Amino acid sequence: TAQGKSIEEALYKAEQQQNKKPFYAQNEILLLGPGAARNVTPYLSYFADENAARPNLAAFLTPLTAEELSECEDVISDVVREGERLIGMGADEQDRTQSIFEINLSGTGGLDGYLPVFSFSKEEKEFRGVRQMVLFRSGAPYAVLEDAAMQMFLLLNGKARQLTVNTQIEGRVVSFRTQQLQLT
C-alpha cells in the first residue's frame, strides 16, 4: 500500500516496496478506497489508458482504507475469489461488474455509471461480498443502491435476467424469485 499526490506517485511508491515492477496485466480486480470514491474518474482513466492493463480489469469500491485492508489479510483471498466470480454474468444471472473499458468515461465529465461495493465488517475483519452499488454522475457518487433496488437497477439496464425480492407485508415475510426475465 502506498499514497501519493498523484496516481503515478502512489504507484511509484508502491513499486519501490516490492522487489520487482508490478505487471498490471495479471490484475483482474481494481479496488478503490473511500478517498478514490469521491471522484473515481482519474483512477479508472489511468488504468484504462495503461497499455499493460488487462482488458477485463473490473473496478470495485471498498469502504476500507489501504491500511485497514492490509489488516484484513485473512480475507484477501475471499475478495479475489468473489471478484473473479462476479466478473461477467454470474451464476445468479446478474452482471454486477463492468470492465474499465465498458465504463462510460464521458470526456471531461467523468464516470457516468455504477460500481459495486465490496462490504466488510471492520470489527470482525470479515468479508461480506457485494451488498451495495454506487451510482456515479460526472465521476461523483450520487446514489447508493442495496438489495431489491440494486437488483432492479441491474435488470432495467440489461445486466440481470432474474430478480429475487424478500420483503414483509403485514408482518409476514414474503419472498419471490423470477427467472429468465427479458425486457422488451
Give the positions of each predicted feature:
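Membrane-proximal alpha-helical signals and transmembrane carboxylates
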Residues: 1-184
